[in-house]
Amino acid sequence: MPNGSDGAQDRRTLVLLFGGRSAEHDVSCVSARHVLAAVDADHYDIIPVGIDTDGRWSLAEAATAAHAAGDLPEALDPTGPAWDPLPRLAELSAAGPVVVFPLLHGPLGEDGTVQGLLELADVPYVGAGVLSSSLAMDKLAAKEVLAQHDLPQARYRGLHA
């Protein structure tokens, strides 16, 4: 560690947010497993938080135990004790540095909704902000913004379902 630091003050809490209500729920659980396996637990206090398909937020205790044992399943289970995001994130932020890593796919995850919640809670997160996330989910709106800024793009035809 630089300057003789023991690294204790360099630790931050990393909330892995995964699962979700979209059709891509299972893909998100697999993504979370791979991120959890790759994160250096010497530098982060990792809190896996799952959202089930009904929208309930839970502390994924089984993932924490499996990670500690070095025996992660192929996909993380998003269930466990209830985890109310706003008060819990406020508590974590008051205790020290915290960042949320949203691993949610599809609507209600990467469309700006979770990013908006985190910004309202004043909690830093990994990834694009509210506007860019919502634009990325609406491909036609994104192309219209690109056109307004004279950015080149492939020809396209917009279809509305």
Show where each model-derived region lies:
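A charged, well-structured terminal subsegment
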Residues: Q153, G158-A161
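ATP-binding N-terminal substructure of ATP-dependent carboxylate-amine bond-forming enzymes
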Residues: M1-L131, L135-E144, Q148, H160-A161
